[in-house]
């Protein structure tokens, strides 16, 4: 027996390993329809079976981690659709399939179509988040695309009436199951876009089997949803039901009722929020007004203390006080003089000589006259000094200055204007006269040359 030069020689185990790698790497994932036979379930929990048709068979294994996700009970003789990868059991050299998922043949075929369309549309970018449109915060009109006799429509309308009874609704009736349903759904979406009377659409129906919901997995529905200029909320079946329409829609709601919750405002909650904000605003306004009132009272008190009339009143009161003190001083002096006269009279009365008495009387009368004259002069002088003091006070009085034809001008901040440099053209200024105020606008300002 002759050998080629440098032949590649395998061991059996090496050959089986190479073949296993070749099968797994080259063939990849396959979908296979067949009938179950020779099903065994050892204590490990793995499944071992044979898939066959009328002409051939292949050994299969489905490990515990994958078979626990199977939703039906496999039995010998049952037709199934499996997703598997090719492999080789090296110890025996047996070619086999490692099953990753298993479904009854009917459901499995639909699931395969679902997965293929999903992958195709995803590759085109129809599921991308950047393609999603933002839902309006407060829709003005909601469109509903569903069966007009289905429970889904009742659920949606019930929720909308409870949350926002004034929200207008437009119903676009369509089939949602069976032959021709997908075309009708696509036409309803197109009709809603052409009429452009709604700013958000709910597309959906109630729960059902995979076949019942299949129209929402059709490519025509998916592409029509993606092309819609109006944002669409999908609401197909129950929370566990997932359709191609859910992936393409701008937002997916788990149920029709949840979709109605999503697109509507809860008016009662909003009214409560508005009432709370109103109470907070009123409280803040009351605090602000109270603070401003206290500040205003303080400013008013300070202004009143500095007001010319207040200063005039203070000066007038001081004059009254000085006048009263002067009158008291004169009265005390008169009383002392009167007391002295009475003492002298008493002393004279105690002297017996008549001549002395007469002379003393004359002297007393003279003294009395002189005293009265002196008192009159003194009183006149005091009154004259008081009048002079009053005139001096009057000359410095702001009110007297105003009475002589002068005026005082303030700017908008209440500050006295003493120079033309303190005003700008267009400023509003207030001029005070003795009998009132005049408000004027500066149209010209010039300095004395």
Swiss-Prot record:
<dbReference type="GO" id="GO:0006308">
    <property type="term" value="P:DNA catabolic process"/>
</dbReference>
<dbReference type="InterPro" id="IPR025824">
    <property type="entry name" value="OB-fold_nuc-bd_dom"/>
</dbReference>
<keyword id="KW-0540">Nuclease</keyword>
<dbReference type="GO" id="GO:0009318">
    <property type="term" value="C:exodeoxyribonuclease VII complex"/>
</dbReference>
<keyword id="KW-0963">Cytoplasm</keyword>
<keyword id="KW-0269">Exonuclease</keyword>
<dbReference type="Pfam" id="PF02601">
    <property type="entry name" value="Exonuc_VII_L"/>
</dbReference>
<dbReference type="InterPro" id="IPR003753">
    <property type="entry name" value="Exonuc_VII_L"/>
</dbReference>
<keyword id="KW-0378">Hydrolase</keyword>
<comment type="function">
    <text>Bidirectionally degrades single-stranded DNA into large acid-insoluble oligonucleotides, which are then degraded further into small acid-soluble oligonucleotides.</text>
</comment>
<dbReference type="GO" id="GO:0005737">
    <property type="term" value="C:cytoplasm"/>
</dbReference>
<comment type="similarity">
    <text>Belongs to the XseA family.</text>
</comment>
<protein>
    <recommendedName>
        <fullName>Exodeoxyribonuclease 7 large subunit</fullName>
        <ecNumber>3.1.11.6</ecNumber>
    </recommendedName>
</protein>
<comment type="subunit">
    <text>Heterooligomer composed of large and small subunits.</text>
</comment>
<dbReference type="GO" id="GO:0008855">
    <property type="term" value="F:exodeoxyribonuclease VII activity"/>
</dbReference>
<dbReference type="Pfam" id="PF13742">
    <property type="entry name" value="tRNA_anti_2"/>
</dbReference>
<dbReference type="GO" id="GO:0003676">
    <property type="term" value="F:nucleic acid binding"/>
</dbReference>
<dbReference type="InterPro" id="IPR020579">
    <property type="entry name" value="Exonuc_VII_lsu_C"/>
</dbReference>
């Amino acid at each position: 027996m002759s050998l080629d030069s440098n032949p590649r020689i395998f061991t059996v185990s090496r050959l089986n390993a190479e073949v296993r790698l070749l099968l797994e790497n080259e063939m990849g994932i396959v979908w296979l329809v067949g009938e179950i036979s020779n099903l065994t379930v050892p204590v490990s929990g793995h499944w071992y079976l044979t898939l066959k048709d009328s002409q051939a068979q292949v050994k299969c294994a489905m490990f515990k981690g994958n078979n626990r996700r199977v939703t039906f009970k496999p039995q010998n003789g049952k037709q199934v659709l499996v997703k598997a990868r090719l492999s080789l059991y090296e110890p025996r050299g047996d070619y086999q399939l490692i099953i990753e998922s298993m479904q009854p043949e009917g459901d499995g075929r639909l699931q395969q179509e679902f997965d293929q369309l999903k992958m195709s549309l995803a590759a085109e970018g129809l599921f991308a988040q950047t393609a999603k449109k933002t839902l309006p915060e407060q829709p003005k009109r909601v469109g509903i695309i569903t069966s007009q006799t289905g429970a889904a429509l009742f659920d949606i309308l019930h929720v909308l009436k409870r949350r926002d009874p004034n929200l207008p609704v437009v119903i676009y009736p369509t089939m949602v199951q069976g032959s021709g349903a997908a075309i009708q759904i696509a036409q309803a979406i197109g009709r809603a876009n052409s009429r452009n009377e709604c700013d958000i659409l709910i597309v959906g129906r109630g729960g059902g089997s995979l076949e019942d919901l299949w129209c929402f997995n059709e490519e025509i529905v998916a592409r029509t949803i993606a092309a819609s200029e109006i944002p669409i909320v999908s609401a197909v079946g129950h929370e566990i039901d997932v359709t191609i329409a859910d992936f393409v829609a701008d937002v997916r709601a788990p149920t029709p009722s949840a979709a109605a919750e999503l697109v509507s405002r809860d008016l009662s909650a909003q009214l409560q929020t508005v009432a709370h904000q109103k109470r907070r605003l009123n409280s803040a306004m009351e605090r602000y007004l109270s603070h401003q009132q206290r500040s205003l009272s303080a400013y008013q008190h300070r202004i009143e203390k500095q007001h010319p009339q207040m200063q005039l009143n203070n000066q007038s009161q001081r004059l009254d006080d000085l006048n009263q003190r002067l009158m008291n001083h004169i009265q005390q002096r008169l009383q002392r003089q009167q007391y002295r006269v009475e003492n002298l009279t008493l002393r004279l009365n105690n002297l017996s000589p008549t001549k002395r008495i007469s002379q003393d009387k004359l002297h007393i009368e003279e003294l009395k006259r002189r005293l009265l004259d002196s008192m009159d002069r003194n009183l006149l002088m005091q009154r004259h000094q008081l009048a002079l003091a009053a005139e001096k006070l009057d000359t410095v009085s702001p009110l007297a200055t105003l009475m002589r034809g002068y005026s005082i001008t303030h700017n908008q901040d209440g500050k006295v204007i003493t120079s033309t440099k303190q005003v700008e053209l267009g400023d509003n200024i207030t001029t005070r006269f003795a009998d009132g105020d005049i408000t004027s606008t500066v149209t010209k300002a010039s300095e004395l040359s």
